[in-house]
């Protein structure tokens, strides 16, 4: 058995109530809270069960770059979790690093390409009013 005494799991509380109190986040799905988490500078440990979620390859690629741990099976997640604790905590204090924001821009904020606006502009060009 491993000793995870330095890990505290929050109960069932609203994410925004604890987002500024955490040193890192563990989540198990690519759902709405993930978009809030990628907007922070904090490490994210993400477990995406392949049996329940199918990510497009670009989302998977960007999440692998953004997350401190990205895994699609329990064993890989626990291995990544152990490595994270060894490398991101020094003398009981979390160590933060740079984060890759491409997932946030491409899947959250958009990269400047607005499909709805594009189709409206195309239609306006074609229908000369």
Predicted regions and their residues:
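C-terminal alpha-helical cap of glycosyltransferases
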Residues: 108-129
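Catalytic binding pocket for nucleotide-activated donors in carbohydrate/polymer assembly enzymes
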Residues: 1-4, 24, 29-110
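Short acidic alpha-helix that forms the nucleotide-activated donor recognition element
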Residues: 12-22
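Residues at or immediately preceding the N-termini of alpha-helices
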Residues: 15, 74-75, 116
């Amino acid at each position: 058995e491993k000793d995870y005494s330095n890990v505290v799991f929050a109960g069932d509380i609203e994410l925004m109530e604890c987002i500024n109190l955490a040193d890192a986040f563990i989540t198990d799905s690519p759902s709405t809270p993930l978009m809030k988490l990628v907007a922070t500078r904090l490490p994210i440990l993400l477990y995406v069960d392949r049996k329940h979620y199918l990510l497009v390859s670009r989302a998977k690629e960007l999440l692998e770059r953004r997350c401190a741990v990205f895994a699609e099976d329990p064993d890989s997640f626990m291995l990544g979790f152990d490595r994270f604790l060894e490398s991101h905590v020094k003398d009981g204090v979390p160590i933060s690093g740079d984060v890759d924001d491409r997932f946030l821009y491409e899947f959250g904020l958009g990269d400047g390409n607005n499909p709805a606006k594009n189709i409206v502009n195309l239609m306006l060009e074609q229908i000369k009013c």
